[in-house]
Every structure is written in C-alpha cells, then in structure tokens.
C-alpha cells in the first residue's frame, strides 16, 4: 500500500496539468518534451516553472510523510516509498508511462527523510551542493547532478546504512540515465551538448 501510494502521488503530471491549464498545450510536445519544472520554465514561463517545481517537490515530501505517519514505521518501506514517487514521476501511469527526470520528487523526499532519520547536517550539505554550483554557473543540471552524485557518500557517512546508500546510488543512476535517454539526440551534437550541460538553466529568447 505504501509503495503504491508513493507511485500514484509521484505520477501526478503537474507539468502537463499546469501547461494545459495556462496555455492549452501538451508539454510533451514542447522543448525537450520533458514533463518537469525546467521544461515548463523554459517553454511556458517563470511562474509556471516555479509552480511545477514546487508541486513536484511536495509530491515527494507528501509521499514519504504519508507513508511514515499513516502507513508504516519501517524505515526501508518509507525510503522505498520515496523512490517509488520518483518512478511515478518519471513514468506516469496518466501519461502512457512518460514523465520527467525525477529531480523534484527526489529532493522533496529528501527534505523529509534526511532530518527524520537523523541526517539534518547531510541535508544542509546537500543544499549547499545545489545552490553554490547553481549560483556560480546558473546550470541546474550540473548543480543537481553534483548533489545527487554526492548523496550516497553523505548517506553512508551519516548512517552507515547499506540499504539507504544503495537506494541513493540507484536514485543517481535512474535520474542520470533518464537525463541521458531524454537528451540522447541532442547530446550527439557538440554544440547542443554544450548548451545542455552549460546553459541548461537559461530560458531561450522567444523573440
């Protein structure tokens, strides 16, 4: 029940719903086709992108908090529920199993899990690993990539939990793999590869 709850909450297609509501278009047919906050930010607007990012964050936090407070006290099941929320976001049952990259629900789940299981310092370090590179490069892909790569080391150092560390590794591989798969055509072109890696945060000039 806990895992199904995580998946269904994660699968709520916020980027699709917000874009449909605001401009009547399908976000899957816009920009890179990613059903997430960054593509919404770039293709629909700043307010829409921020709204989607916030909703996606809440999906992850809500999934693990519902699991923890209402469904189970078993830490492994709660952590897996957060992981399932990311899977639901990336492969939504409502969008023919298409979706985003999972950053929003992943970080939303961590906002709850790390403090609850005694790792508030790791949450602070993780936040710095996002915001410092983001401030220096304005590159959300690079900043979140650094944070996700560091997550297994932070979790292991703070908890020595093999299970939690394994889930952290799988989370990094899943989100990183989704990024590569979603952008595989663009990554073949050196110019596009540079834009995706260096300028991924910037909104294009709509003219």
Swiss-Prot record:
A GO molecular function held by the record: acyl-phosphate glycerol-3-phosphate acyltransferase activity
Reaction(s) this enzyme catalyzes, per UniProt: an acyl phosphate + sn-glycerol 3-phosphate = a 1-acyl-sn-glycero-3-phosphate + phosphate
Any one biological process term the GO annotation gives: phospholipid biosynthetic process
Keyword Transmembrane annotated: yes
UniProt keywords, alphabetically: Cell membrane, Lipid biosynthesis, Lipid metabolism, Membrane, Phospholipid biosynthesis, Phospholipid metabolism, Transferase, Transmembrane, Transmembrane helix
Domain of life: Bacteria
Subcellular location field: Cell membrane
EC number(s) stated in the UniProt entry for this protein: 2.3.1.275
Keyword Hydrolase: no
Pathway noted in the entry: Lipid metabolism; phospholipid metabolism
Principal cellular location given in the protein's record: membrane
Top EC class, one word: transferase
Pfam short name (any one): G3P_acyltransf
Residues that span the membrane, as ranges: 44-64, 77-97, 112-132, 140-160, 161-181
UniProt topology in membrane: Multi-pass membrane protein
Leader peptide range in chain numbering: none
A GO cellular-component term linked to this record: plasma membrane
Family membership noted in the UniProt record: Belongs to the PlsY family.
Subunit field text: Probably interacts with PlsX.
Main function: Catalyzes the transfer of an acyl group from acyl-phosphate (acyl-PO(4)) to glycerol-3-phosphate (G3P) to form lysophosphatidic acid (LPA). This enzyme utilizes acyl-phosphate as fatty acyl donor, but not acyl-CoA or acyl-ACP.
Name of the protein in its database record: Glycerol-3-phosphate acyltransferase 1
């Amino acid at each position: 029940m806990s895992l199904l709850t995580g998946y269904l909450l994660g699968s709520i297609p916020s980027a699709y719903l917000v874009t449909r509501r605001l401009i009547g278009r399908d976000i899957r047919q816009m920009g890179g086709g990613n059903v997430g906050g960054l593509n919404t930010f770039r293709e629909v607007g700043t307010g829409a992108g921020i709204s989607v990012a916030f909703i996606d964050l809440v999906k992850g936090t809500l999934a693990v908090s519902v699991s923890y407070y209402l469904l189970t006290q078993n830490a492994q099941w709660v952590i897996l529920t957060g992981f399932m929320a990311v899977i639901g976001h990336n492969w939504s049952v409502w969008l023919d199993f298409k979706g985003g990259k999972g950053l929003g629900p992943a970080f939303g789940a961590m906002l709850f899990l790390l403090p609850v299981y005694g790792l508030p310092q790791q949450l602070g370090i993780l936040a710095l690993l996002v915001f410092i590179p983001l401030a220096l490069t304005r590159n959300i892909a690079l900043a979140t990539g650094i944070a996700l790569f560091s997550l297994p080391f932070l979790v292991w150092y703070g908890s020595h939990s093999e299970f939690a560390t394994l889930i952290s590794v799988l989370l990094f591989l899943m989100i990183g793999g989704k990024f590569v798969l979603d952008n595989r055509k663009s990554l073949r072109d050196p110019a596009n590869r540079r834009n995706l890696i260096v300028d991924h945060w910037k909104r294009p000039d709509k003219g």
